[in-house]
Amino acid sequence: MKNIMIVDDATTVRMFHKGVISSINRHIEEAENGVEALEKALKAPIDLFLVDINMPKMDGYRLCQEIRQRDELRTSTVIMISTESAKQDEERAYRSGANFYMSKPVDSEKLKVLVGVILGDAV
């Protein structure tokens, strides 16, 4: 079974994302920040990360860089999600190693379809 991790410091946002993708029927982990996410991911590899950019302790950019540097996580897919919609924020996300970038508020149907496509599920 493929594993998904939702990384966001806001509990309500994690709950929203979990509700959107729960029908995909995958194991879903949660983390409040990049440090916690990395610790959990190194214990049980993650196939797909949904990562907020602005978080305490370790932001999404740094987390993405750490994921790309770890052999056991390097092939994971990363969707960066941010309230920032400026072109330079999106470019920085991709330079950090993100595969996809979405601006908040996230379109729930687009997120569900994207996650399904990434994991090879029909949605």
Residue ranges of predicted features:
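Two-component/phosphorelay signaling modules centered on CheY-like receiver
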Residues: 11-29, 118
